[in-house]
Amino acid sequence: MRSQSLSKTKVLLGMSGGLDSTMAALFLKEAGYSVIGLTLKTWHRNPGIMEQNAAKAKETAEKLAIEHHVMDIQKSFKKEVVDYFCREYMMGKTPNPCNRCNPVIKWPALLQKADESGCRHIATGHYVRKQLLNNRWYLKKGADPSKDQSYFLWNLNQEILQRALFPLGQLSKEKVRELALNNGFQDVAVQKESMGVCFLDGTDYRDFIVEQNGFTSLRPGNIVDETGRILGKHRGLAFFTTGQKKGLGLPDNKYFVVRLDSSNNQVVVSKSASLKTSKIYLSNYYLSALPSGKELLEVDIRIRGIDTVPTIPGTLKIIQPIGLEVNFDHPAWGITPGQSIVFYRDDVVIGGGIV
């Protein structure tokens, strides 16, 4: 079904059963939309959690008198997100599964169901906004800096952004919680906020990787200093990350991880090397505003999606055939392959990439 034939008053809302999607449903209904809730049943280490979430979402839908559906996407989620997560770590990278899930699994699933249901709009409870500039939609930071989730949605395409609604983008988490209490949703208002990787169920990611892939999937190798001198052995790159000092198994506890050399399957350590960098190059990136020739594009750069990590001012430059040169005005600490890096002009997301 093409978007031109979809009802402008119907919206497909992703519902997890938690506070944010519950209040998004309420706000959309109060705004006059005909809301259809969809719970995506993703793969989880503890399958019962997903059943509980679906039941909570259904209960909310019944309370609001809106339609509710469940879509089972466990197989595709396992392949594209969980297996990717494990594979990247085993290669010595630091992946962000949310940045993988949103453009590849979650939003395409919402879009598919929206088309099937005749919904012009798709919505979620993310704390972000959007803005139309020069006939192009851009993602924008949420009004509450402490809950802004734009870092995790930087790679949504134009079709999705054009149809997306973000009812919570202008609100703070505290205000949403207050409104939930005032509107009879005490259960979700006091519900503990979920943190971390959704499918780990609180398990350490290293234990999870072994659990999913077995010890035989790990490649033991050498721990070396920056000159290549062998200092010890490791049981797999997945057990290490840049800056790590504990758990190296070396007699001298002054060493820390400088980088993970996946091509040689080595953990490189040092006692004195700096983990700060002023420049990186990206081959896997997207920009809505491309610098031309020698022109530098001034941006604010976010490396991690945690609200306590501020953006760093910097510049972008296209270097052919290498890709995108990212220069930081102030050195950034501990950048590792696999991380997402997002670029902003003021509060507007203009692109991003994978280190």
Spell out what each predicted region is.
Residues 123-129, 138-355:
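AMP-forming adenylation/ATP pyrophosphatase catalytic core
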Residues 1-154, 173-175, 257:
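ATP-dependent adenylation/nucleotidyltransferase module used to activate substrates
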